[in-house]
Amino acid sequence: MGKGKVIGAVAAAVVIPAAAVVGAIYILPLLDITSSNTLYYFGNDASVAADGTISLGKEEVLGYSSKYSDTMTGYFKAQLDENETYIYNTVMYASENGYSDIFLPEDVFDGSYDRLQEIEYVITFLSCDSPFVAHNYTTNSKLTGNVEQFAGKSYHHIQLETLGAEYTSRREAAYEKAKSVVASIPQECNTDRKKAQYLYNYVAENSVYVTDGYSTRNVPIADLLIDGKAICDGYADTVTMLFNMAGIETASANGTNNSKNEGHTVNFAKLDGEYYYFDASADSIINEKGFKPAFYFGMSWEEASDSFTFADEFANRCPKAEKSLLSDSTDIVISDNSEETVKKAAELLESGAFHNRIS
């Protein structure tokens, strides 16, 4: 059986043997797509492996484990059905292994959503589980899709943004940096809370919150760990990665910053058996002003909701954390980063009334 090839550009027609179509996922190589590239096949026909073509059955796709499994727990993946998991694992595989084009068969969609909407829905959860899949894939025109016909069958062609070798290099550099940060945790940090405090402190104090000149093509975790600057998703992804690598179950959630009505991302993590919420980007902004209290470290659901509105798809899926690590002696909850709020924080610090700082 011959191998399929890309004809011309990415969006051009693809020649595929009819016998290789049923129940398949197709993924095209990420870099330098030309007419000589092999079409990679994923489906139930394990015989399609000639001339270097890779073949994976559906069960293999469903059973795929992340190359970076130490950085994620799959909190949201555990809440998906089989077809959603099929999409989740396919996009995760493509992202981790360097592919930009995916062809999803119609039978992986349940019909309750528009096709692209369902894919965006699943990728959103993947991006909150994995620090290596950008949150803005589905919000900054990085994701496009259209239905194409192959041998009489319909496939949804998804194109992820092509990022190239530099992206891969920065991702790996950030991963190695994360390993060294986790390895630096002092021996006296022998509980989940102490480990989390140490890592959260590292993130908040070794980065600057920036928006001007920020490119959506950046690698958020590398922006923070390598360059020392990031936006909220860089902070959240880095917390996800570091906490999980330290054995602390962590994921992130998307929503809106209440004070600015802008998109925002926060974390939740399980410390010593209890879930709490975290906003390292907000604490980093306070840190830049000369203060180091953990006003956003270990919030309850209610406290997190004072400054953050969870997106609808997260409101019923995220843990409703009841406990808080915020100091009982603090009579305000910071809901913005205005000068007045920071002034109040300074007064609390000077009075000695606030004891929930990172040390």
Question: In which residue ranges do the predicted regions lie?
Answer:
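N-terminal accessory/pre-domain segments preceding catalytic cores
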Residues: 3-12, 17-190, 305-359
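Short, solvent-exposed coil/turn linker segments
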Residues: 35-38, 112, 219-224, 259, ...
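Short amphipathic alpha-helical segments
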Residues: 115-118, 195, 235
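Solvent-exposed loop/turn segments at secondary-structure junctions
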Residues: 165, 205-210, 230-232, 257-261, ...
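Secondary-structure boundary elements
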Residues: 166-224
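Periplasmic OmpA-like peptidoglycan-binding domain that tethers envelope proteins to the cell wall
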Residues: 222-233
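Hydrophobic/aromatic-rich core segments of domains that either
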Residues: 234-304
